[in-house]
Amino acid sequence: IACNTAHYFYDRLAAALPVPVLNMPRLTAADAKAAGCHKLGILATDGTLLAETYQIACRDIGLEWAAPGEQAQKGIMSIIYDEIKQGKRVDMQLFNAAVDDLHAQGCDMAVLGCTELSLVKRDEHLGPFFIDSTEVLCKHAMRACGVEPVGFED
C-alpha cells in the first residue's frame, strides 16, 4: 500500500488478501529505531495524523513520537495540497518551520509520512534527519522479492 493514510485500513486489507501486505508505517518506525532514533517526528497529512498509524507504530516498538504544532501542521498541509499537488515549488520556509517545531520537541529524526513529501527530499536533497516512508516501503518490497535494494541514499 503506497499511501500512508490508507494504512488506516491495513488490518482489514491484510486479513482479506491472500498475499502478504507490507505495512509502511510499521516498517518506517522500525527502520528509524534501528537507525538510532529515539523520538520520531511525523510529517504527514491531517488524515494520517488522525488515523494515528505512525503513532501506533511508534508506540508498539517503544519509540517516542511528535507531530508538528497547529501552525506548522497547516504549513505541511499547504505544502502537500497547495504546492506539490499543484506542481508548484515547495516553500522551504514553511517546511523548515515544521522541522524546527519537531526539533524543538526533541525529535532526532522525522518521517516524510506522505508520498508527496518524498518529492521534497528529491528536490531539496534533505539530510539524514529525514526517513522517507516511500523509500522504506520500496526497499522492503524489493527484499520481499529477493532483491537487494541499490541506488538509495542512506
Please give the residue ranges for each predicted region.
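Non-catalytic structural scaffold of enzyme domains
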Residues: 1-154
